[in-house]
Amino acid sequence: MQNLLPSKVFFTRGIGRGRTELQSFENALRSAGIAQFNIVSVSSILPPRAEIISKDDGLKLLNPGQILFTVLARNSSNELNRMISSAIGYAVPSDRDHWGYLSEHHAYGETENEAGYFAEELAARMLASTMGLEEELKWDDTRKEYVLENKILTTRNIASTTVVLKKDEWTTVVAAAVLIIM
């Protein structure tokens, strides 16, 4: 069997609205720029040495209909005025021969920043726990990311939040880490 180790990853997000939940999900994927692919959800490992690239650069490497492995956070509602959010957090180790973590989070009533920071902290804590150092993990106000002395290179997040605007209309938010196998 071929080694399916992704070498690149990009992050994206989207918001969609529609008459049905499925339509709103499709529109959220379109907004995120990934509706033209066959999406397969995978768990939360950022592969060793995977290069983080821009969405635009990542999309240039893909073909419509291609099977696309993603860590996908998704949330939907048709409740008027309901705030929904989804977020992906990531933590990259300093030792790039070690794997990192991707975390997905979806919630109701959280702002984009709240959802994003929750997902980012979750990824950082998962990575720190694999090193037996979860208690040493700290937020660095200057760098605006979680740090673990010489162990975590960077943490970030991407989030999408919106409010259901119309009665009887479905709204979906997505955030995704798209893993590219070259």
UniProtKB/Swiss-Prot annotation:
SUPFAM superfamilies: Pyruvoyl-dependent histidine and arginine decarboxylases (SSF56271). The keyword Lyase applies. It is an enzyme of class 4 (lyase). The modification Pyruvic acid (Ser) is found at residue 44. GO terms for biological process: arginine catabolic process. Keywords: Decarboxylase, Lyase, Pyruvate. GO terms for molecular function: arginine decarboxylase activity. The record marks 43-44 as: Cleavage (non-hydrolytic). It catalyses: L-arginine + H(+) = agmatine + CO2. The keyword Nuclease does not apply. Its EC number is 4.1.1.19. Its cofactor is pyruvate. Binds 1 pyruvoyl group covalently per subunit. It holds the Pfam family PvlArgDC. Belongs to the PdaD family. HAMAP family: PvlArgDC (MF_01404). This is Pyruvoyl-dependent arginine decarboxylase. It comes from Picrophilus torridus (strain ATCC 700027 / DSM 9790 / JCM 10055 / NBRC 100828 / KAW 2/3).
